[in-house]
Amino acid sequence: MSDTSAPQKYRRILLKVSGEVLMGDTPYGIDTNTVQSVAEDVAEIVKSGVELCLVIGGGNIFRGMAGAAKGMERSSADYMGMLATVMNALAMQDALERIGVETRVQSAIPMATVCEPYIRRRAQRHLEKGRVVIFAAGTGNPFFTTDTAAALRAAEMQCDALFKGTSVDGVYTADPKKDPTAQRYDRLSYMDVLAKDLRVMDASAVALMRDSNIPIVVFSIKGRGNLLTVLRGEGTHTVVAEDRAA
């Protein structure tokens, strides 16, 4: 059992998880064991007293840009991708509530019989009451990624940081899965990321985080307990902030 009593650097964070992470070792869809592992990590954070909201991608089910590349009309493909994020959000809500974490899903596309609509002040009240809020359906608009949605919600919720949980333990000079000589950055500025096109998040998301002065912390969510470790400023990760000394 992880020690959740250590002091935390942040009061409120947004956790962005790619849909691909939820596949686990399966080629498609939702791996329930992986969802449960992420839910247990989130539960540890909530137990430590940090307020947490969550954005999950939909790439494990459908990716709008991939559909558009195969000839689909981009808006239709993006809406399908947004609906995929709702499926992932409901799976995560179920996993969290089964271990006793109060959770609300808010969708940018209204679907009243399934979840709450996105209402900023209501979401803030949920967080203040110790509930996890999962933001689904991206921004509700095509042509915007879930990275941009995560950045937008982090700014609206006045989060202290955006944690991006991926399958890689930080930001590298090249794809470490393809280039064994790739080196990991400990810290980067927002301008470094944009100028070097490092693909931490899409450019609009990075620019919004820069304008809101919200650090981006990139880490691997695949290791159990990594989220709490990185939250304490420990473990392997990359911080993107106003300057390298931030």
Swiss-Prot record:
GO terms of molecular function: ATP binding; UMP kinase activity
Name of one Pfam family that matches: AA_kinase
Function: Catalyzes the reversible phosphorylation of UMP to UDP.
UniProt enzyme class: transferase
Any single biological process term in GO: UDP biosynthetic process
Subunit structure of this chain's protein: Homohexamer.
Family assignment from sequence similarity: Belongs to the UMP kinase family.
Protein name (record): Uridylate kinase
Superkingdom assignment: Bacteria
Activity regulation, short description: Inhibited by UTP.
Functional pathway: Pyrimidine metabolism; CTP biosynthesis via de novo pathway; UDP from UMP (UMPK route): step 1/1
Residues annotated as binding UMP: G58, D78, T139, G140, N141, P142, F143, F144, T145, T146
